[in-house]
Amino acid sequence: MKLLLLDLDDTLLQDLPVSRAVLEDLGRKAGVEGFFARVKARAEALFREAPFYPWAEAIGHSALEALWARYSTPGLEALAAWAGPFRERVFREALEEAGGAPERARELAEAFFRERRRYPLYPEAEAFLAEARRRGLALALLTNGVPDLQREKLVGAGLAHHFSLVLISGEVGIGKPDPRLFRMALCAFGVAPEEAAMVGDNPQKDVRGARLAGVRAVWVDRGLRPEDPEASPDLRVGDLREVFLAEAL
């Protein structure tokens, strides 16, 4: 194998657990229970009503990310203007549903925007990347989302220097599981599909996309996403340490 394709969110970087922790903490301070689930549900419902939702869906930009993305990438000015009222409405409706104080919606929306800017890695991530380099593997990052937020995560986590290539769906216009994104990486390094492997936590995006591109697929099952019977990985691991231990790559 010559090329390792890697996902970012919840593969190398803790993403969903951080959003959950921040929202639950804000909920406790606001005196409401189950705040993460309520905010997530309202955000997803209202996000689907946004005029740009088909584009967001195509590039894999989530409703939770819309609660803290800066939308500072040129061309996303309309999203930046839309985001403030969207966030306030999400928190207001979540508070109303929970019997909280809806007048605190803006305060909590702004608090989440600030406090969500955390980029903790999974404990084994750095050692895994070092081992990949020791083995002489080229590293490419394939991540879905809007450019400014994904690059903020990448830099904030101190990961940028590891990758020879970074493909962000919002920059190239296509996202996982579209096999064209995987083929872009293959072409950039001049390797055949059988000389590469994709490592990611999302069966629908990472595993399915890799299989469509003819690339070996490693599912990092962190217990955050259900198994997809139509997207079977070549290797299933509990964390990144098991990838090279399996000697399947």
UniProtKB/Swiss-Prot annotation:
InterPro entries: HAD-like_hydrolase, HAD-like_sf, HAD-SF_hydro_IA, HAD_sf, PSP_YsaA. It comes from the Bacteria. One of its GO terms (biological process) is dephosphorylation. Keywords: Amino-acid biosynthesis, Cobalt, Hydrolase, Magnesium, Serine biosynthesis. It is an enzyme of class 3 (hydrolase). It catalyses: O-phospho-L-serine + H2O = L-serine + phosphate; O-phospho-D-serine + H2O = D-serine + phosphate. GO terms for molecular function: L-phosphoserine phosphatase activity. Its cofactor is Mg(2+); Co(2+). Pathway: Amino-acid biosynthesis; L-serine biosynthesis; L-serine from 3-phospho-D-glycerate: step 3/3. Its EC number is 3.1.3.3. Disruption phenotype: Cells lacking this gene show serine auxotrophy when grown in a synthetic MP medium, in contrast to wild type. Addition of L-serine to the medium restores growth of the deletion mutant. Catalyzes the last step of the phosphorylated serine biosynthetic pathway, i.e. dephosphorylation of O-phospho-L-serine to form L-serine. Is also able to dephosphorylate O-phospho-D-serine with similar efficiency. Displays a poor activity on L-phosphothreonine, and cannot use L-phosphotyrosine, pyridoxal phosphate, glucose 6-phosphate, or fructose 6-phosphate as substrates. Belongs to the HAD-like hydrolase superfamily. HAMAP family: PSP (MF_02240). Homodimer. This is Phosphoserine phosphatase. It comes from Thermus thermophilus (strain ATCC BAA-163 / DSM 7039 / HB27).
